Structure formats: C-alpha cells, structure tokens
C-alpha cells in the first residue's frame, strides 16, 4: 500500500492506495508548528479508524508547499511506517513531467503532481484549476510541457479578506447562491464570492486559450472544485483526487529506481 500526502497551506490531504485504487482519504487542518511526533499522533487515529496497520504500508509520496513541515512529515513517515518518502518535485517527476519554464525548480510540488495526473488522464494539451488556499491554474501545452499558469487568491482566502476588512460584513457559509442579485447582505456576499470566483476562472481560462491559440480540456480539483465547476462555462471535468493521483504516479516511477530514491532521501535529509 502507498500513503500519499498533499500538504497545503490550509489543509493537508492524505490518501492510502492499494495499487491504483484509492482506499481511504482524509482531510485535516495544516498546523505549521507541528513536529514529527505530533504528526505521528495525528496519523495513528486515522489509520486505526480504517484498520490500517502502519507497517503494512510499503511506500509514501509527499507534496508539500509548507517548507517547515516537509522534513517533519518525512521524519514522521520514516518513524511510523519505516520508509523514506518520495518528495514530489520537477526533478523526482522527471519522465512524467516536462517543463518549458525558466526555472522548473520553483514550480510547487502540488502543481507538479496536478500536471502529472492531468496529463496521464487527459493527454495533452490540458489545463488544471486547483481550488485551495490559492487558486492555481496549470497549463500543459500541445507538446505535453508545463508552460506556466496562474496563481491567484483562493475563494476562501478572498472571503476571509473581505470579512476581516469590512466591519459590517460578518463571516458567512459559502453555499451555492440562488441568484446573482442578492436580496439581503448574506445572499449578496454569497453571490459575489462564489460567482466572482466562477467568472474569474472562466475569464482566465479563456484568456489562456487565446494565448495558446487553441482550447483544451479543463479539469478542476481541490476542496471547492465541485461548487465552482457546476457553474463554470469552461471546466469540463472534476477530479477531486487529482493531486494524490499525481503523487501515486510519481512514486511508481521512483519506486522502480531504488538508487535514485535513496539519493533523493539523502539530499533532503
């Protein structure tokens, strides 16, 4: 079995795979101060709830956009499971991930994993929209190369900024708005936040298509993907587990090269 972990700025998503099948998935809050011991304490009840024996997991893959947690997670995995995690990057995804980009090393691990999974599933070209703390758009061109994209404030990040700066506007639930014209303050905020995100994404994707000179499938992932995608005019598919799937693919490639895996572990220790 494989443990895949996607460490985001707000949430951390964990999945356990048996071969290509995702057996279990959990979403927990990201706490940037956690030590490896605290992460192990968090993992144990998750495993226990599904009857998973940690030592039965024979591999781990990690994508982290929180540098202070990368080593903590690697240590937690090593001590609890007894394996060295494959840390996703443009380098470890070589062969699955090609980039026509000035500095591939600066591409976030989550963006690499998304691109790997999207290209594997949909071919090239393909566009990924990942709704998280940031709304990321990744563009893979007709050659199969990652060429860049967009990083914008995420829907919840934008909402929190509004709540914190507008004294009379309190926090609301981000439920589906019923109309663009809100009939009270709460409805108006819901319409502005949700439809604003929908139209922002659609507008950016159409600009990307014009720059490319052709259209492509657009796959949405992330915690709010379903809510936005059903109102979108450009999103063509939803894959909530896209990042985890990308981690699985990167791990499978690395697992066939033990020497490379060991080198990666040593260089990041």
PLM region spans:
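Short glycine-aspartate micro-motif
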Residues: 2-6, 59-61, 126-130, 219
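Extended, charge-rich low-complexity interaction segments
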Residues: 116-129, 133, 264-269
